[in-house]
From Swiss-Prot:
Keywords: ATP-binding, Ligase, Nucleotide-binding, Protein biosynthesis. NCBIfam families: gatB (TIGR00133), PRK05477.1-2 (NF004012). GO terms for biological process: glutaminyl-tRNAGln biosynthesis via transamidation; translation. SMART domains: GatB_Yqey. It comes from Mycoplasmoides gallisepticum (strain R(low / passage 15 / clone 2)). This is Aspartyl/glutamyl-tRNA(Asn/Gln) amidotransferase subunit B. One of its GO terms (molecular function) is asparaginyl-tRNA synthase (glutamine-hydrolyzing) activity.
Amino acid sequence: MEETLMHNFQPIIGIEVHVVINSKTKMFSPSANSHRSDPNINVHPIDLGLPGTMPEPNGFVVKKALVLAKALNMQNVDHHLRFDRKNYFYQDLPKGYQITQQHHPIATNGYLDISNKRVPIQRFHIEEDTAKQLNEDNHILLDYNRAGSPLIEIVTDPVFDSGKEVKEYLTNLRRILIFNDISDAKLEEGSMRVDVNVSIRPMGAPNYGTRVEIKNINSINNVEKAINFEISRQQELLLSNKKVVQATMRYDDQLNQTVFMREKTNAIDYRYMFEPNIIGINLDQQFLSEVDQIQVFNIKELESKLLSEGVDQQFVELLLDNFFLYQKINEINQRINDLAFVSKWLLIEFMGRINKQKLQLELINPKWFDNLTDLLVLVKSEDLNQKQAKVVLDEIIKTDETVAEIVDRLKMKQIKDEQEIIALLEPIVLENLAILKDYDQRKERVEKLLIGLLMKKTNGQANPNVSIKVLTDLIQKHR
């Protein structure tokens, strides 16, 4: 059935993404830009549009927008900053209009590559957020902490034809936003919000089908699921000779389906007008030079670098999804100089223990990362073997001791001096001369037996590589 549907219809999908910028203050007021505060604490008269207030654009946000323009390959960047009023009345917008950039977006005509196509980005513009609205016990609760928060809205051409493509685009976009410190891009907290427009048309038809908008999706995985469900829903309607109604839907992750919110009728006339309280601002050369000095991370280049260093693909994906871990792996690697080795220890052994204890990564003891680095130095230098290192790592998370203190307490310091190992191993060889006659036929078995006796004698502290070398010499000496 699904194969037949896909042959008969072409999905057309466009994406609009709103991201809250990592700024200490709001877009046009000095009020704190924080969604974690108690409700209605971070509210300024400018946010409410009280008489006599004058909005002042946040220069930090403008810089972040220009960094994003580089990261998204925007061909046209407007250095003459202008704003418009979007007029409408709703309870989440106390002043009756939103300051945005309808007619003069700061950047147009860019792109972001995914695996099978180049996604054209029509535009992105700066605007202010509205209040957060909560429905509770037949009441509408409003939190104006969010009103006036700085937003960037990013709009693509409708070039996607599957939920899988959209998921890849959003994953890549989110990485760009996080690595370049533009936004923390947390869908579950609302700092990245995705609106999806989905329509289908018979294969080869010239006109688009009726568009349905899906809002309030709380994860990238759910975006993919919502799109796939909506495509199937619209296909089934058309095959049943029913019409697709232009509507706004939401995604219910319990039902795993889109749910009707409201019907869309004619486009609202927002009566856009030039924002009279903010004159056009020319971005001067000094301002632009400061932006040019900001490092812009290219995610594809980072991915290629990690892979070329031997980091497994699964680890690369984890690192590109978590800037904190990416920073930590590079900090640790400054002393280790082996990214593949560090990634396995950080992401499997260390993070395995962190996740098991359900600890919040950003809040764990910074000393643990220093201790992990010291531990890996010992492993690389073969002063500890892998088994010993895992025991030490357990102790790092349990205690406040340094690695040196833990190793000393557990008597794990490896014996690497050849003369010391000769003194320990030669008596073992002399006590077991009878088995040396089998050495040529069963070399591995004989070596394993004698090294095992040495490890038992030293509680595993004899260095394996040095021990094998010494054993080979002793066998030749006493055969």
